Amino acid sequence: MNRKILIAALAGAGVAIAGAVLYFTDTIERQPGALAVFTPKAAKTVPFWPARVTTLAGDGIPGALDGPAASSRFDDPFGVALDSKGHIYIADAGDTNRIRTIAPDGTVATFAGSSEGFKDGVGTAAAFNTPSSIAFDHEGNLYVADTGNHAIRKIAKDGTVTTLAGDGSRGDNDGVGRAARFNGPVGLAVDDTGVVWVADTYNDRIRRIGRDGTVTTVAGGRRPGNADGIGAAAGFDTPSAIAVATDGTLYVADTGNNAIRRIAGDGTVTTVAMPQEGERRPVLRRPAGLALTRDGYLYIAASSGGRILQLTPEGEYRALQDADVPPDADGFGPDGTVQLYGPRGIAVERDGGLVVADANAHRLHRLSRPRAGEAPPARPQPVAVRREAPMPWPVGPQDTVHEVVGVMGEVRGSYNGDSRDHFHAGLDVRADVGARVLAVFPSKVSDPYANWGFDSLSEGLSLGPLSYIHMRVGRDSRGKPLDPRFQLLLVEEGKARGRPERVRVPRGTRFAVGDPLGTINAMAHVHLDYYQGGAVVNPLTLPFVGFTDTVAPRINSIALFDSSGTRLRPPQGTRKQPVLDKRLRVPRALGEVNIVVDAYDQVDGNLARRRLGLYKLGYQLLRADGTVVPGYERPLITQVYDRLPRNPDAVKAVYAPSSGITVYGSKSTRFAYAADSRLRDGEAKTGSWNVAALAPGEYILRIHAADFAGQVALEGRDLALVIE
């Protein structure tokens, strides 16, 4: 995945400090410009090194639990910083709102903060609201971008928390200390003179806080934009991270523009990295974390897609390769790169390794070069937390059953003619156009860029463990904001003046159960994606009030195809010479064949025309008398739609080409499953059925097609065969 950046390079960056990469020490004389960066001079950065991923802390369940690393819990780990003694500092937001530490022995503890609020004090007497980026100065003070409080906080080495700038209210004023205002600042870095640089995220500006507390604006205009230029002529869109080199050069993760920007000492903004035009699935998507090495390499946390990118001083970027996960030969599995779930803050260790906060997985990871003879660590799996209490529905009335019109794992196409473009990743609940979409969990926005697709059919919002899609986010059917939590941007010029052109839902925004999130758009349903530990899991595991399923799946047909894709058909007779034995004859000489099952499901309350996907699929081989063939005592379950592969192309491994739905141009909705291909535990693999291994004779191929409720299709499940 080479990416040549033709716009600019990072040459001459010099020794660099990022918002989460600064080490400090008591042994170095503190003078202006005397920075203690403890990367050994001999340890030069290796371009595009293979990374081994190990888990440092967090058991994958959201919470706030101190103690041993393996049993500790984090809610929304974001910013990361390291000190000279090997301690890792983490800004843990969500419901935790604390600054936490991991000691060299792995013990997790709370350094500052307790309940959500805005309060100075010592240690746990202080209060934060959604802390994000953190960074040390060379005196050992830790600075915090306190996003929900629209403020920058300072923590002394003894744990005393004070407010450096901002008064807790949203605004864009320059000024001194509390006279200045910010709008949800997420990114922060400190240079070697003690100046604090802030990515003022929802003001779309870069701000500077001098040593005397004076706040000034360095770059960015009044509104989101995408433009190079000087000062206010430059445009950013939701900048969420910032890093600074010792020569004063700034690097900005311009999240909404999928770009990395550079700000020179004179305020000139240039773009140094962004996806190439037309790139199908770019790796540089929604950058949310940055870290600079002393020799000018920039690490980027791409929060959408989960990659960790390295940008060289020459301007080339790639995703770091995973030392223990090679690329899948079929092209349907891993691509060989490190892929976390929701990487945010990054810090560079002394040996050049990385510490990364994975907010969506509720874990902290280390990326390091593998050592000779060292066995790869076990990869932690997403933790499933079963919910027992009845769940409200995402549309009103929330305590009344609504029709489910789509389930996870169904095939979906694209509008450019591909009938198998991606998996349907969630649950669809029918509702009238204009109906309000309502929150089903008490949740807080984590992602700095939480909503997308303004005025498109796919418009949606990521909130807590769910994404709500196919709605006008934060607006009623007339485009009016539902409440002040939604920041509506209006057109300022021309005939469309006064009309909404965008809505923002900032990081740290809270919603209670039943709060309106938007209104149903022309898709006439709300789509729910459900995440646990970062992985997309089946929303049918949520116990929605009154939901029942007593309808068994149905099988339309079972077909076999040879390796060339030609369907095997039973013998065809004529009127004069009818064929009495219409069993399908399968020559052993074919070797490998493919089993394709056309099947669908329904649930209680579905219209007769509704077609839903299966939850579980497999097959069993019987003799003609109904006795089982050895090795097939139980059905061989090949596909379980509890989790989905992260590679969207995996849909082509488990669905035959004849699959498709009418929304994307197919004549009818058809789920034609490649039943011998595997999908288990979120991993897909193409497969086949080896008929050459069978003895000649008469058999019955029995399909096991089940729904989430455990009901199995009975009619049409058997295909009589003669292996010859």
Regions found by a protein language model. Give the residues of each.
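Long, low-complexity serine/threonine/glycine- and acidic-rich segments characteristic of extracellular
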Residues: 506, 512, 548, 566-568, ...
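Conserved beta-propeller blade signature
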Residues: 87-89, 141-143, 195-197, 249-251, ...
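Residue-level detector of Asp-centered blade-edge/turn motifs that repeat once per structural unit
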Residues: 82-85, 136-139, 190-193, 244-247, ...
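Gly/Pro-rich loop segments of beta-rich domains
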Residues: 42-76, 107-132, 160-184, 214-240, ...
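A short loop-to-beta-strand structural motif that recurs across blades of beta-propeller domains
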Residues: 97-100, 107, 150-154, 160, ...
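Short loop/turn segments immediately following the C-termini of beta-strands
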Residues: 93-94, 147-148, 201, 255, ...
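Blade-level signature of beta-propeller repeat domains, shared across WD40, Kelch, NHL, RCC1
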Residues: 342-378
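Surface-exposed, glycine-biased beta-strand/turn segments
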Residues: 373-467, 472-479, 505-516, 520-526, ...
